[in-house]
Amino acid sequence: MNYKKVLTRYIQVRLSELSNVDDYEPNKLALTNLLWFLGKVTSNEVIVAKLKIMSNADRKRKKYLYRYDGNESLYDDEYYKAVSAIAKESLKYLQNKKE
């Protein structure tokens, strides 16, 4: 199965659902960035690796900020939450398509 084609279609559908939302809304921005990434990559393994990294983005960011910066207002970032959620949904979508 070609993950690039499957995910590209999935993301385009998701973006069409968000067509009337501001371009900088966290979910739309994360989907747009993922679509850009898919345009640059060809390997299924690289796509899965990127999604796994993205799925932990919010947790890793909080851990890093906690260690080096005491400003708790930076811990909850809507964009990184959206990135993590979309990556998890995409991985789940790919898993369901495989079966």
Language model feature labels by segment:
Residues 1-33:
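Short terminal alpha-helical segments
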Residues 2-5, 38-46, 93-97:
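Alpha-helix capping and inter-helical loop/turn segments
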Residues 7, 11, 31-34, 51, ...:
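Generic L/I/V-rich hydrophobic alpha-helical segments across diverse proteins
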Residues 11, 39-43, 55-62:
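Short alpha-helix boundary/capping elements
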Residues 16-28, 41-48, 62-74, 99:
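Charged, low-complexity interaction regions
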Residues 26-33, 37, 45, 78, ...:
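Alpha-helical oligomerization interfaces
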Residues 58-99:
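Amphipathic alpha-helical binding modules
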